[in-house]
Amino acid sequence: MDDVAGFSVAEFEAAMDRAVERSETVEFYGHKPGVTVPVDKLEAIVAAADERGLPFVLYSDFAHGEGNGPGVALSLDDNSVSLWDDIRPMLRQYNAHLTFFVSRYTRLSDDQKATLKDFLNDGHELQPHSINHLREPEYVEDRGLAALMNEEVLPSIDALRADGYPAEAFAYPFGARTSEIDEEILKHVGVLRSLSFPYGFPVEDACP
């Protein structure tokens, strides 16, 4: 949904129309409301889903073998807690439920974590997105798969679970993955989220 991807609201609407026709769930993701994705664009996407009667699917639904469609799975990544909190009234207006894939969770303040906990009251969920938001295939090449799991993946899962979140899905930073990493992480969560991009799309780190 970020503007850098170059997709218009009309293109998101067309994707939702295809989801209705094919009885599929379409996945949209972004980062910082009001920064990387304009709030009015995000609201237009949410409103379009509501107008089409598309259920809002969470990634925990996928982990449980549900949410196959038609539906729309919306997610925001990283740790822009205050920006996410700002859009909660808009999301409530449409009864929209999002998955927030959180990176650097262990570095958040107690106040930020308390704000995230409040998101559950609106039907949203938190899922892990790694500790340091690194390109995981490169990490494995440099340090090995065990180091990736022990230093980046499992601590992000365990930190959320320690605070009461089930942590049933994992989103790859930059969407970068390999089948070897998939196999290892799937021992600990039920579903993975990677990404696909149009040819030539620049994948940049939207984290602070």
Place the predicted regions along the sequence by residue:
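Metal-dependent polysaccharide deacetylase catalytic core of the NodB/CE4 family, i.e.
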Residues: 1, 24-35, 69-72, 82, ...
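A generic secondary-structure signal
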Residues: 14-18, 48, 90, 155, ...
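A short acidic, amphipathic alpha-helical/loop segment
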Residues: 15, 41-45, 86-90, 114-115, ...
